[in-house]
Amino acid sequence: MKIIEAFAVKNKCYQAGAPLTPRGIMLHSVGCAQPSAAVFARSFNQYQPGGVSVCVHAFAQADGTVYQTLPWEMRGWHCGGSANSTHIGVEMTEPSAGMTYAEAAEQIAGTYHTAVELFAELCKQYELDPAQDGVIIGHAEGHRRGVASNHADPELLWRTYDMGYTMNGFRRDVAEAMAKEDREEVPDMPRYDSVAEMPQWARAGVQRLIDRGALQGNTDGKLDVSEDMIRTMIVCQRMVDEQKET
């Protein structure tokens, strides 16, 4: 995912500059046949786009690009209700009128996955739980909760193209994306097959374990131990030695 800062500095909302402490994120779809987020970023950079006081935080498109039009901690005007004071607003772009059904479905899937990735990043940044009630909501869900105006997005678009997407599924996908990112951030710990391969600090302690028969390795004669295993064994051996001394 690539986030391009394209702040709508001419927009009335941006110039108002009201602060926002994000407690959730609202998902929208733009409601018109335009797949380019850049087009929306440009059109929103005016005082009142289309004569309306409106501004969302970002637009997501199918290739993984996000155009950010407001700082995340600035109050947006994206839902016509009180959720403007609590939620970041993100719009997904929609297929162009000239696309085939298959092309449109591909575009929708692309924007969906871009949105999932963005929401996962924002949830991590602001320590939000995507599974918690009310944290991630669609515009239509916001209306049913009484915190947004009467819109049917984004699920109307998904149903129109029979995508099988739902907001419940979206929340699950965001949670999974966060979990996957956490797993990828944990580096693989190196393993050592012999004392000679180990860090200097570990060699004497491991050799004592081998001499005492506490560490023998596998059938190939390889120790195959990680650094955390080495530390644990050495600490345990020291505790045993201290008990013997007392």
Regions found by a protein language model. Name each.
Residues 71, 120-127, 175, 179, ...:
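Sec-exported extracytoplasmic/periplasmic mature domains
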Residues 1-84:
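N-terminal catalytic cores of peptidoglycan-degrading enzymes
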Residues 54-55, 110-121, 169, 200-204, ...:
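Extracytoplasmic/secreted proteins, especially bacterial periplasmic and envelope-associated proteins
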Residues 2-8, 15-19, 95-189:
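Basic/polar, cationic surfaces and motifs that engage anionic cell-wall
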Residues 81-93:
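Short coil-to-beta-strand
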Residues 32, 92-97:
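Short connector loops/turns at beta-strand edges and beta->alpha or beta->beta junctions
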Residues 185-246:
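Short, solvent-exposed alpha-helical surface patches in non-cytosolic proteins
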Residues 20, 83, 104-112, 116, ...:
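Solvent-exposed, acidic/flexible segments
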